[in-house]
């Protein structure tokens, strides 16, 4: 009989010691997504308003964005992160609340960039909603 090969995979996440990183905040009209990466762009932690338990129109509130930002920041701080740059994208309500939550939890924000994509008259937008 042939021996079975056992693949041993660790279930625990490896803690990295990363001093500084980038916080990407994508704030849409329906949700807020917070991703924290190292300087090369490798994701360390992430959180969304929907992931925090909010559903429907409550996902788009500033409070939901604040909770998502705090959760992602706590995980990043466990990995040794102290200073961050913030890239904000989108027109949503949770933009400022997410940045304030990062500062309140103890991360030092060195730069805030608005990287919202603006078309130079590219694609035709969808037709207007009539309710």
Curated annotation (Swiss-Prot):
Gene Ontology molecular function, alphabetical: rRNA binding; structural constituent of ribosome
Alphabetized Pfam families for the sequence: Ribosomal_S11
UniProt GO cellular component terms: ribonucleoprotein complex; ribosome
Keyword rRNA-binding: yes
Disulfide bonds: none
Gene3D superfamilies: Ribosomal protein S11
Stored InterPro entries: Ribosomal_uS11, Ribosomal_uS11_bac-type, Ribosomal_uS11_CS, Ribosomal_uS11_sf
GO process annotations (BP): translation
Keywords, comma-separated and alphabetical: Ribonucleoprotein, Ribosomal protein, RNA-binding, rRNA-binding
Subunit structure: Part of the 30S ribosomal subunit. Interacts with proteins S7 and S18. Binds to IF-3.
NCBIfam families, per database record: PRK05309.1 (NF003698), uS11_bact (TIGR03632)
Record-stated family: Belongs to the universal ribosomal protein uS11 family.
The protein, known as: Small ribosomal subunit protein uS11
Name of the gene this protein is made from: rpsK
């Amino acid at each position: 009989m042939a021996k079975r090969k056992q693949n041993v995979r660790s279930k625990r996440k490896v803690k990295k010691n990363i001093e500084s990183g980038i916080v990407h905040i994508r704030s849409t009209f329906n949700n807020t997504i917070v991703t924290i990466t190292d300087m090369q762009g490798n994701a360390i932690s992430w959180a969304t308003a929907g992931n925090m338990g909010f559903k429907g129109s409550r996902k788009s509130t500033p409070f939901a964005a604040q909770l998502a930002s705090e959760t992602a920041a706590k995980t990043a701080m466990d990995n040794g992160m102290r200073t961050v740059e913030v890239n904000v994208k989108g027109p949503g309500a949770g933009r400022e609340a997410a940045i304030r939550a990062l500062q309140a939890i103890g991360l030092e924000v060195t730069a805030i960039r608005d990287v919202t994509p603006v078309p130079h008259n590219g694609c035709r937008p969808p037709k207007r909603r009539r309710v």
